[in-house]
Amino acid sequence: VPSDYDAYLQETGMPENEIQKLDEHVKQFIVDDLKNGDGKFEYMKIDVGKQAMNGREEDFEWIEFYASAFQIGSTIYIYPTYEFAENKKPCGNDSFSFLLGEAIRPYEFGGTLWYKDRTMSDWEVSGNLIANNQQLNGASYSGSQLGTPRSAMKFMGTTYCHASVGTGDDNRILMGYSYQPKEVRVELFGWRLSRKQIIFVLAGGVVVGSVWWRKNKGKTQK
């Protein structure tokens, strides 16, 4: 049976297949936040990508990324979300990062973390998420707030990003998760270079890799 949250999201023009990808808790998180906004939001299509930050792309089969965006006037609300598909054990040094194209200029961040162990049938709230590294074109959430469980379990982090319409037409979002980095946190950073973007992957202030994020390509280039 479709929930009230489904009905609200349908009203925004969000496609049904996108709605059904979302966990019920995530739908509620999004709808509650949209209702706190100023007026009636409409679904906004964005180009979603992901980046393996400390490993190969195939290492990322155990994590799912989602992002939905909604717009009213010059205001955009975006919800970058990750979900573990397998039980894992974050070490207190993980990070979840996202970068936005120049069409979106963020100014406020926050979120909620859920957990679910082997004995649980539904998610429980772990706590609030705070963007402890905020950029002009994105943010990262890192450290013990992403979970430090004694045994492996699933985590789901839903974040909100309130933004205003930017200068360009590049409406991509690139998300990445760094799982159990060896010594220091790994985060995404971006510098705009004319019509392209180069994404630096940083570990403790040292560039450990870079990615060309091209304007007219659907996927990221290694």
Predicted regions mapped to residue ranges:
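Mature secreted bioactive peptide module from preproproteins
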Residues: 48-218, 222
